[in-house]
Amino acid sequence: ILLEKRNKLLKVLYEQHDIDVQTLELSLAEPLPAKPYPLPSGAPHYLELLKKTHPGTARFYTDMDSALQKNLRRIFEHRSREFSHQGINNAAALIIETATGKILAYCGNTGLDGRNARTSAVDIVQARRSSGSLLKPFLYAAMLDSGHLLPDQLVIDIPTRIGSYKPDNNVPLYRGAVPASEALSRSLNIPAVRMLREYGISRFLDYLKQCGFSTFTRSADEYGLPLILGGGEITLHEAVLAYAQLMNAACTRPAFTGRQALRWIAFPFLPEPHG
């Protein structure tokens, strides 16, 4: 009975032009395996995303690179085992083509081998998580674009209290005045908070939405200045797309030289549709 079902399925695949005649003949000649084997599951979270965003579709054509996906999964699972000893049981990875935003490899979570059965089904690429310091480059870009900041302009890094809010750096060290480019490269918290206050929270939220972030649904007053230090939630997918467009824009204009005030031309952060 199993052999008949197998052969019938192979013939259906041939009739649908999914396999050629040589593959059909070779497959029909193959004996049945001694036991059932699990179906291949190369990118289960991405498949679930496609099913969710394209209901009723039974077949999907993607831009994924199968070799890259397999290599990413191998490295990903190996590293996740190391991190599990530190109590880190969830992680995600996404690789895109920066020029188009096309997804080339997608790992939504760790533990797909059964090690983390309780939470491995959660797709962290699409899940909302604290932004941490990921929004700082966008604040710097917004201020450069608007003429509020120069790369070598000195920004203040001193103990700061704004109302009841007292931000601090990751290490208890204050540098006084530092170039804006250095403050960004060191991911200093206090300069970022002071810059957000100068630029305006509401204005920055509008800028983030233009960048493609859809998760900022509360008011500027609700987010407050902690927004720049992880007080808001983003998804990894939207962050990767936004960073790709940030990179694309930076690569198409001359580098800043000294204190020269080169205005950044506004640019779209969402990938353009490709047929």
List where the protein language model places each region:
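Acidic/histidine-enriched alpha-helical segments
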Residues: 2-4, 15-33, 88-96, 155-161, ...
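Non-catalytic, structured segments within soluble enzyme domains
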Residues: 1-70, 209, 213-220, 224-230, ...
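Active-site SXXK
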Residues: 8, 13, 72, 101, ...
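Stable alpha-helical elements in mature extracytoplasmic
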Residues: 2-9, 23, 46, 50, ...
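Conserved catalytic neighborhood of penicillin-recognizing serine enzymes
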Residues: 37-52, 149-204, 248, 252, ...
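A penicillin-recognizing enzyme superfamily signal
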Residues: 62-83, 95-97, 106, 114-127, ...
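Flexible glycine/proline-enriched surface loops and loop-helix/loop-strand junctions
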Residues: 53-57, 119-125, 175-177, 185-192, ...
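A short, well-structured edge-of-sheet supersecondary motif
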Residues: 50, 86-117, 206-211
